[in-house]
């Protein structure tokens, strides 16, 4: 036998608020949802995404492990 009254109340028209404005309605177990970011203002979805790479990842790896682009490999040093 299934237990009665164990499921939360379902709100089919729950309002989603972002910056004080209703941005969409969805089904939820809460009547109102307040979010900071949604697809309408997220940089990835709006096309305003910027990749900020202050230091190249490869250069950082090489510096971290003591390899620089000016060093020669061991094979080149033994041939001289």
UniProtKB/Swiss-Prot annotation:
Enumerate the UniProt keywords alphabetically.
Ribonucleoprotein, Ribosomal protein, RNA-binding, rRNA-binding
GO BP field: translation
Decide whether keyword Transmembrane helix is in the record: no
Against InterPro entries, the record matches this protein to: Ribosomal_bL28/bL31-like_sf, Ribosomal_bL31, Ribosomal_bL31_A, Ribosomal_bL31_sf
| GO MF terms, alphabetically ordered | rRNA binding; structural constituent of ribosome
Q: Is Ribosomal protein there in the keyword field?
A: yes
Q: Which domain of life is it from?
A: Bacteria
| Gene Ontology cellular component annotations, sorted alphabetically | ribonucleoprotein complex; ribosome
Q: Which family does it belong to?
A: Belongs to the bacterial ribosomal protein bL31 family. Type A subfamily.
What this protein is reported to do is described as: Binds the 23S rRNA.
Under the subunit heading, UniProt states:
Part of the 50S ribosomal subunit.
Q: What is this protein called?
A: Large ribosomal subunit protein bL31
